[in-house]
Amino acid sequence: MKIVLAYSGGLDTSIILKWLKETYGAEVIAFTADIGQGEEVEEAREKALRTGASKAIALDLKEEFVRDFVFPMMRAGAVYEGYYLLGTSIARPLIAKHLVRIAEEEGAEAIAHGATGKGNDQVRFELTAYALKPDIKVIAPWREWSFQGRKEMIAYAEAHGIPVPVTQEKPYSMDANLLHISYEGGVLEDPWAEPPKGMFRMTQDPEEAPDAPEYVEVEFFEGDPVAVNGERLSPAALLQRLNELGGRHGVGRVDIVENRFVGMKSRGVYETPGGTILYHARRAVESLTLDREVLHQRDMLSPKYAELVYYGFWYAPEREALQAYFDHVAKNVTGVARLKLYKGNVYVVGRKAPKSLYRQDLVSFDEAGGYDQKDAEGFIKIQALRLRVRALVEREGHGA
């Protein structure tokens, strides 16, 4: 039997690699995706080989991640439960897509992942796998093995000579990519406990951020960001640049309790500096370029799209149908937003667009601009008609 494992190089997937070989008598191919997590991918590849993988594949997927997953999601204005910009959720279908592809190329019968049986990631990985290859076998060791906790896993690692660099458990777990870093578990499981001050890796503490604000301009073309401060950049390079700018000023920290797809509530702390800047910049350009009813309709559909991404339905027909709508709307989003970054905050201070629907002569108090204010009287009376009828009926105590 041959299995392709999504391998990070950490404790869990290193143990899983050895466990798969022992339990299934299988040949294991390790796959590591570089999506901007900041870890040494080549080091993880070498570690996989030392741990017993017959082959280790490492791919740089940063551009594909941002171009084909993050940017389409951002065109939809997706935010889960009002705060979460979906940094972990959007990475899973990309990784699973390549897991399935490699399994097909290598003639493997199964894929495996290190997601636990309590979280969302198991669903995201497996829904993607079954959507792309319905007959694929998926192995989820966390749902099969008998380890009762980290101590038993560390003991297993030591007994099998697995090169785990640290045996001391961190007070929280962390997952990183080019869009964000997430923290959960351990000391963060108490929703009343403030996150440890030294936990954050991507952003400066807002209290210690520069005392002077920094301005940044983000240019959009047909829905996608294409330049920062006038410099055109590739999708991954653009997001990285904004991560650096936002991180310097403590932008993008979020601490929430969210509803997992599997039914439980979970506390998550996130850093999304570049994504937060892009969210505000996009809204600024959209305010000029989108018709009122289109914008309101888009905002009604965005939460459903975010839910689909969070749940793992990236390759589902309903997500694809919504994407077609959002992509059509985004074709009008061309322009520039100017923002001020200051001690954890993002302020929109300017916006412009070549096809702006904003007409200064119409809204100016100093110019008529072709708008007759007397027209408002009839408009208001028509809008008030149903309200007046309701009030009259209630006053009379009976209907017509």
Curated annotation (Swiss-Prot):
Residues the entry annotates as binding L-citrulline: 84, 89, 120, 124, 173, 182, 258, 270
Annotated positions binding ATP: 6-14, 33, 114
Record's subcellular location: Cytoplasm
Catalytic reactions on record: L-citrulline + L-aspartate + ATP = 2-(N(omega)-L-arginino)succinate + AMP + diphosphate + H(+)
EC id: 6.3.4.5
Record Pfam families: Arginosuc_syn_C (PF20979), Arginosuc_synth (PF00764)
GO terms of biological process kind: argininosuccinate metabolic process; L-arginine biosynthetic process; urea cycle
InterPro entries: Arginosuc_syn_C, Arginosuc_syn_N, Arginosuc_synth, Arginosuc_synth_CS, Arginosuc_synth_type_1_subfam, AS_cat/multimer_dom_body, Rossmann-like_a/b/a_fold
Principal location class: cytoplasm
GO cellular component: cytoplasm
First-tier enzyme category under EC: ligase
Keywords: Amino-acid biosynthesis, Arginine biosynthesis, ATP-binding, Cytoplasm, Ligase, Nucleotide-binding
PROSITE patterns linked to this entry: ARGININOSUCCIN_SYN_1, ARGININOSUCCIN_SYN_2
Record-listed L-aspartate binding positions: 116, 120-121
Keyword Oxidoreductase: no
CDD domains named in the record: ASS (cd01999)
MF annotations from Gene Ontology: argininosuccinate synthase activity; ATP binding
Domain of life the protein comes from: Bacteria
Gene3D superfamilies: Argininosuccinate synthetase, chain A, domain 2, HUPs, Single helix bin
Pathway involvement of the protein, from the record: Amino-acid biosynthesis; L-arginine biosynthesis; L-arginine from L-ornithine and carbamoyl phosphate: step 2/3
Family classification: Belongs to the argininosuccinate synthase family. Type 1 subfamily.
HAMAP family: Arg_succ_synth_type1
NCBIfam families: argG, PRK00509.1
Self-association state and partner proteins as the record states: Homotetramer.
Protein name (record): Argininosuccinate synthase
Organism: Thermus thermophilus (strain ATCC BAA-163 / DSM 7039 / HB27)
Gene: argG
